[in-house]
Swiss-Prot record:
It comes from Chlamydia muridarum (strain MoPn / Nigg). This is Uncharacterized protein TC_0825. Pfam families: DUF2709. InterPro entries: DUF2709 (IPR024484). Belongs to the chlamydial CPn_0658/CT_538/TC_0825 family.
Length: 238
């Protein structure tokens, strides 16, 4: 087993932070570094994966993260239409209120004028509620705007909450931060609440064979910086 210099440095930093560094914990830390493992647990399914990327790839294949769907985006109802008989017009902005669109168009235009940002006219400090009125069919017709066809947009829905996202990367990032909980390999080894994803389980079973742990210790023995820790591990085993 050949352990690179950079990983040895990380191992030494890890060991110096431990009060009583154990061999298994050290070896698990080594596996994290050498195999680039960043375990995460998908709590809903009680499954641990070797990395967030691995979790997303496998869960996507099982259609457990997202589904594609379509939504209609409408422009809203027209302010004036063919059935309109009278309109009330804001002289400051041109905003129009039709008698058949608003339940009470007078109240609507009064409310608008009281807070209209372009209405600078004041009387006794109060916004003047001045507006224009027309029953002329030709004037009314000039305000009719044909409704736009609704737009059809493809979006992505969370398979967990149903929440919509405009893009798949945004949804996946939300899933990663909201539903995948990071764990250390030592935490994975010491827990019994969650099961390991099959390929991750196979990888760990292979890596945790006694012969490979012994090879790990032998590789460290070539570096005097690790001798004090190896001595502790040997004494513990004896």
């Amino acid at each position: 087993m050949n352990i690179s210099g950079s990983i040895k440095q990380k191992l030494l930093q890890f060991l110096k932070k431990q009060k009583s560094p154990e061999l298994l914990a050290t070896y698990l830390f080594y596996l994290e570094q050498s195999l680039h493992l960043s375990p995460v647990v998908f709590v809903r399914d009680k499954v641990i994966f070797k990395s967030a990327e691995d979790a997303i790839a496998l869960l996507e294949a099982d259609k457990k993260i997202w589904r594609e769907t379509e939504i209609q985006i409408s422009s809203g109802k027209p302010e004036v239409n063919e059935q309109t008989k009278r309109i009330y017009i804001c002289p400051f902005t041109g905003k129009v209120f039709a008698d058949n669109v608003y339940a009470n168009p007078l109240d609507a235009v009064y409310d608008w004028l009281s807070s209209c940002p372009q209405n600078k006219e004041r009387q006794a400090g109060v916004a003047v509620k001045r507006f224009l009125v027309s029953d002329d069919p030709e004037v009314i017709r000039a305000y009719i705007v044909p409704p736009k066809e609704p737009l059809i947009k493809t979006v992505y829905a969370s398979a967990i909450t149903g929440k919509l996202f405009h893009s798949l990367p945004t949804l996946l990032e939300d899933f990663k931060t909201s539903y995948l909980r990071p764990m250390t390999l030592e935490e994975v080894q010491n827990q019994n609440k969650f099961q390991l994803e099959s390929s991750f389980l196979t990888l760990l079973q292979d890596a945790l064979e006694e012969e490979k742990i012994a090879e790990f210790v032998e590789s460290l023995a070539d570096d005097t910086a690790f001798h004090e820790y190896i001595s502790q591990w040997v004494d513990t085993e004896e």
